[in-house]
């Protein structure tokens, strides 16, 4: 699956990384002779990329391997590229995926950040406005909040207590948004403690760094 996904990116067939063999079959139908199905991916998001050419090790793309894990192995502080989370189009790209919008679904996507109650209220208001204009709307939520939304499509990333599951489901859910032909997507933010930065990095790219902050 990893080799096929690399081939997929070279051919520029799709924007979202495949996380199941069925995704590879869909994207590369007729272009490859065989798919070896090892089941869904165990992690979901791509690897951590680290720059060791500067005075301090720097994470250029966050992944499942966190800066804390790297610090324990390297025996020194590992810093994080400030352009990972903040939108900064002036920075010269140093790692794959930093320049191009690789993770975007077809529909416009917005991340809503804030307290749980404020996020639910704002997303429902935004959904209602879109539906009034005849749009089909998806909400990316969690198991804890999914029943609070009134969108046409509600997709759960899993429980906030299981950030590994959130990472596993991310690309599958973005793909489902395309398959369901939604017109707009609103997503909760996912500031989880361990790999939350990697998850948010991918979501921010998918949303083109479009974020609504609410209290």
For each feature predicted by the language model, list its residue ranges.
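Charged helix-capping and loop-helix junction motifs
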Residues: 18-23
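A C-terminal functional module that forms or caps the active site or interfaces directly
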Residues: 91-208
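Short glycine-/acidic-enriched loop or helix-start segments at secondary-structure transitions
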Residues: 16-17, 45-47, 149, 196-198
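Conserved PLP-enzyme active-site core in the AAT-like
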Residues: 26
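Glycine-rich, Lys/Arg-enriched anion-binding loops that position phosphate/diphosphate groups
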Residues: 31-124
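Single conserved hydrophobic/aromatic residue that forms the stacking wall/gate
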Residues: 1-13
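Short, flexible loop segments at boundaries between secondary-structure elements
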Residues: 211-215
